[in-house]
UniProtKB/Swiss-Prot annotation:
EC number(s) from the headed UniProt entry: 2.6.1.9
Similarity annotation: Belongs to the class-II pyridoxal-phosphate-dependent aminotransferase family. Histidinol-phosphate aminotransferase subfamily.
Organism: Flavobacterium psychrophilum (strain ATCC 49511 / DSM 21280 / CIP 103535 / JIP02/86)
Record-given protein name: Histidinol-phosphate aminotransferase
Pfam families per the UniProt record, alphabetical: Aminotran_1_2 (PF00155)
Amino acid sequence: MNNFNINNLVRENIKNMQAYASARDEFKDFTHNMVYLDANENPFSNGINRYPDPQQKKLKGFLAQQNKINENQMLLGNGSDEVLDLVFRAFCEPNVDNVITLPPTYGMYGVLANINAIENKEVLLSANFQPNINEILKNINENTKIIFLCSPNNPTGNSFDDQAVLTLLKNFNGLVVIDEAYIDFSKNGSWLHVISDYPNLLITQTLSKAYAMAGLRIGILYASAAIISILNKIKPPYNINNLSQESALKKLEQSTLNFHVKKIINERKKMVQSLISIPFIEKIYPSDANFILIKVEDANKRYNQLIEKGIVIRNRSNQPLCENCLRITIGTKEENEKLITVLKAL
């Protein structure tokens, strides 16, 4: 990679600002004997009367050990959308800079670009849903700050070619964000093991999918310590509440991740085999995620028929390259069997 310098990317007002700090940010170790008269809290204990740990030390410590990474290379957010928004706000100058996204893909990249007044350059994936590297490189200019890669991709379900990702990491002097929300369901490994090799690499993951904690809203961003330090300047001080931190840590310690992932992957295989025999399904796309994208002869019709039967899936027909496509999340064995029964009866 040529001439990457994070100081050339960060917004000037962010570069020079001082982060908000609570008094407790100054303490690395707390004891039960400490008296807290710093934050104007209600002193009467009910289990939630105190502000949460702004640094999420226990939760970060567990995740750091699990992923063999330093805590200063990690940022936790109120869902992945918060950490993605922080990346926009730290590095993209409104009404000046641009980002590149690769439709069909996760819609929040475009939404966050609009919220932050950043031009979103859309470079369509190829017919087999892979990054069109030549077109991406053509669209990069001096104001391009970020390229977003969702791999495994939502809604298509496939993982991106390693060589394509490496080409961008090595040739783009901006930030490459790889969204790995579905990585635990993929036969491909995470890019986390090379996070220290590429200072322009950011990886987002989540506890919402494989870890079954969508209700807690905890997203994770991994990057260099320099990038994390910048993002910590603008992170709200108490962005993850006590209940979420404690519940997440408890569930991680009792993790049934491998068991659930294996069941979902097995159900995914069974779902594909069942869908093959349904006449109006024209194509079943390969999936590395916990969902399957299918092409049917009339997506609106089939979507509405399923709604009438009390089954909610996602109609992705409004996405580029996804005409008449439906996205089906892999559910429990019973839910999947009900879906197949209804589809066969349509």
